[in-house]
Amino acid sequence: NEKDGLIPNTEWKKNALGQNWYLGETIITGIGQGYMQTTPIQLCLMNAQIANGGYKIYPKIILDDQKQDKYKDKYIKLYKDQKNIQLIQEAMFSSTNEVMGTSYRSRIEDPKYQFAGKTGTAQVKKITAEERELDLKTFEIPYEQRDHALYVAFGPFKHPRYSISIVIEHGGSGGTVAAPLAKKLFKMIIDRHEIRKNFDTNKYLNI
């Protein structure tokens, strides 16, 4: 029951709303605002395709042996210029691992666990000019009116294996509540991967 996402453009706005597209909408769409709509799974998929260098991924929950060859050898490159992907990867790394980054407090310095990510928020209501001038803290806003907190990340950074998308309903800031959770998850997931990798199956089967 996954809902369709939406990356708006001039054609969509003309057909859906009967209105012209403005330059300012191109700018805000580039940072995920405006009419853009995504689900957490779509965010996770996009993030994974950035991590793997820009190749299309066909997500699946359970591997069906009868269909496992369906996507074999379908290495579709989504971006013409590899430099654009590298720029995004480096920007996400900086956002997490460099001072002034929005999730810097959740960084892990050990390269084994080091990840790259980006914080975000999703508004649940239109904010008026008067409300914006009040400059309220998250805890001062009624719970049901607080932004949802978002965070997407991939890791380990040098050899990406995992993509994470986190949404905390009415959590406020992604850097405050979602990124710290990602830090815990990466530590746990990578440690468990090490255990599986070092597990000698034959040793235990021969007992």
What are these regions (language model features)?
Residues 55-56, 176-179, 188-193:
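Glycine-rich loops and low-complexity Gly/Arg-rich segments
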Residues 172-173:
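Short beta-strands and strand-coil junctions in structured, solvent-facing domains, enriched
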Residues 1-165, 207:
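Beta-lactam-recognizing serine transpeptidase/beta-lactamase-like catalytic domain environment
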Residues 67-77, 183-207:
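Short, gly/Ser/Thr-rich active-site loops of penicillin-recognizing serine hydrolases
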Residues 39-45, 177-184:
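Short amphipathic alpha-helical face segments that pack within enzyme cores
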